[in-house]
């Protein structure tokens, strides 16, 4: 079996496992407390909505320009530049985020986004960096590992944070810290 065929098979298996984990959790576990599960889903959805503003296509530029940069021996420079770009974009995004809520201060009172900013903003940075790493590693025909981080880890984060909160009686802050910690672990991995 070739490398591509093995990677494709493993990719499919990970996808099915992610589907199975999500389905079992949604049917049997999350209905115990839909309010807290809704908060977790809001945080993840808001984060996923804001990540493209920070990444701004830099993750896909690693795939698109990788061949040319590798020919010139500068593919590591392209990767480093992408990481610096994400850092700069995140700072600009933070400036815009706080400027928006400063200018339109009435949104601060009724906005869940503003209330959850201490969790959402670090997750935006972590997931933006993860997007760059995941696309970069795909240049080396390694698609299974990023698929684990993109499909399995969010479901494990939801399930773990929910279980900590509902079944083990941990506070929301501890559950949110676990939720963020799983994504940080995915970035480190």
Question: What is each model feature region?
Answer:
Residues 149-164, 168-189:
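Hydrophobic alpha-helical transmembrane segments
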Residues 30, 67, 138, 165-166:
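Helix-capping/transition residues at the boundaries of transmembrane alpha-helices
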Residues 49, 53, 109-133, 184:
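Alpha-helical transmembrane segments of multi-pass membrane proteins
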Residues 32-42, 69-81, 91-125, 167-179:
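Membrane-interface helix-capping segments at transmembrane helix termini in multi-pass transporters
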Residues 11, 37, 78, 135, ...:
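Alpha-helical transmembrane segments and their helix-entry boundary regions
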Residues 3-59, 94-98, 123:
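Signature of the first transmembrane helix
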Residues 55-70, 139:
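Helix-loop junctions and terminal segments of transmembrane helices
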Residues 5, 65, 127-150:
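Membrane-interface junctions at transmembrane-helix termini in multi-pass inner-membrane proteins
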